[in-house]
């Protein structure tokens, strides 16, 4: 009969092993395509190509290398969060100010996407600022990826809830509950940008803080939200 302490240790070890297996399988899956592209492109560079063609294929190699680097970093980050290897470092700060800061940094200078920000208060929270910034970045990156040019992304804080809403197509109802799962994509064609880890990382950060989160469709487009305080 295991004691309470032994059972907790066993469960933690089981969780770490599960995450290790899932991360290994995910790495093999996610790196297969970019590695194939790198191999094929490297073979083409071995041919006698014009300088402009060489520059093009070198750009492809750089792009795929960056994709692999991002996927590996995101998977390792998610693994550390899920296994508890990364502890929370709580400090007091204004969530409204952090959200406005991340919104301003979310778009490239030449983007035609508009942004709107509204907050009832500064909303002081005691949380891990760096991790919440990462979670907010994930919500905003997702919004940017699915907002058409000329569209709008709105960040709103009220009644203990922060929401990110973007103009664009509605999310299929059967996909809404699964959006926070690692590697899940509502578009089975995988034409969407990203590696499918951002929202999962965000949810893990929210879970660590004891926050709830969700996604829904609105009249103007999808909305992702998390509750950080009672009303």
Predicted regions and their residues:
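Short acidic helix/loop segment immediately C-terminal to the autophosphorylated histidine
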Residues: 46-52
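Short alpha-helical segment of the dimerization/phosphotransfer core of two-component systems
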Residues: 63-68
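Conserved micro-motifs of the catalytic ATP-binding
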Residues: 83-88, 124-127
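Short helix-loop "hinge" at the ATP-lid/N-box region of the Bergerat-fold HATPase_c
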Residues: 143-144
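Short conserved segment of the HATPase_c
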Residues: 171-185
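Conserved glycine-rich
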Residues: 210-211, 215
